[in-house]
Amino acid sequence: MGVQHLLKLRMASPHPHPHPGAPLAARPLSALASFFLARPSSTAAAPPPRHVTLSCSRPHCNHNQWAASRCRGTAGRRRLQVVVAMSSSAPPPPPGSVQKSEEEWEAILSPEQFRILRLKGTEYPGTGEYDKLFAEGVYECAGCGTPLYKSSTKFNSGCGWPAFYEGFPGAIARTPDPDGRRIEITCAACGGHLGHVFKGEGFNTPTDERHCVNSISLKFIPASEDSKL
């Protein structure tokens, strides 16, 4: 059937607005013209975009975890960096971190060190090696090597024992004597006896404290050999 014949039939039709499902002969003139005269597109229409769900091949991850932490790899690396950064400035040993039996201490300490550090003895005033020493350096525990005092905190108290106005943070433990008259100071790491601390004596120091320490309880490390200053 030719186009002209269809057009004639359409013009003679009594129904100007047929149903969309009507045959071609019953459709409007504009629809017929579009049907026969429209050129086919040279390029097919692009398919609608599909929704893509990201997933991870690692069995322990779902796509939400992948999007949030890239299979936890990024978060794990960050945690590792934090741990490394924290370890670069290590705090002093925690209290009681050096544990030895009294027999072990007796084997590694000299008799005088054992008497003072472990049996809480006291050396005679004015006889200690470090009483009059004011060189720059660090004083460590003679028992376990924990840094206790900077030389910059040492002062001349005239008492006959080395005197310091403060120790390294967390390095010194304080325990009141049973009679309550004095406060004993010990190495926080190994419990070695250092001496006693007194406050309010009027010394011109930042803390108005005097750590009265036995020289035998200490080991001096000169500044040229120490990196903790």
Curated annotation (Swiss-Prot):
Enzyme Commission code: 1.8.4.12
Residues covered by the MsrB domain: 102-223
Chain coiled-coil ranges: none
Transit peptide: 1-71
UniProt-recorded Gene Ontology molecular function terms: metal ion binding; peptide-methionine (R)-S-oxide reductase activity
Obligatory cofactor(s): Zn(2+)
InterPro entries: Met_Sox_Rdtase_MsrB, Met_Sox_Rdtase_MsrB_dom, Mss4-like_sf
Residues of the active site: 212
One of the protein's GO biological processes: cellular response to oxidative stress
Protein's cellular compartments: Plastid, Chloroplast
Broad class of the protein's primary localization: plastid
Keywords: Chloroplast, Disulfide bond, Electron transport, Metal-binding, Oxidoreductase, Plastid, Redox-active center, Transit peptide, Transport, Zinc
Cofactor descriptive note: Binds 1 zinc ion per subunit.
Superkingdom classification of source: Eukaryota
Binding residue positions for Zn(2+): 141, 144, 187, 190
Catalytic activity: L-methionyl-[protein] + [thioredoxin]-disulfide + H2O = L-methionyl-(R)-S-oxide-[protein] + [thioredoxin]-dithiol
Disulfide bond entries: 159-212
GO cellular component terms given for this protein: chloroplast; cytoplasm
Family, similarity comment: Belongs to the MsrB Met sulfoxide reductase family.
Function: Catalyzes the reduction of methionine sulfoxide (MetSO) to methionine in proteins. Plays a protective role against oxidative stress by restoring activity to proteins that have been inactivated by methionine oxidation. MSRB family specifically reduces the MetSO R-enantiomer.
The protein's name: Peptide methionine sulfoxide reductase B3, chloroplastic
Source species: Oryza sativa subsp. japonica
Classification of source organism: Eukaryota, Viridiplantae, Streptophyta, Embryophyta, Tracheophyta
Gene name, Swiss-Prot/TrEMBL: MSRB3
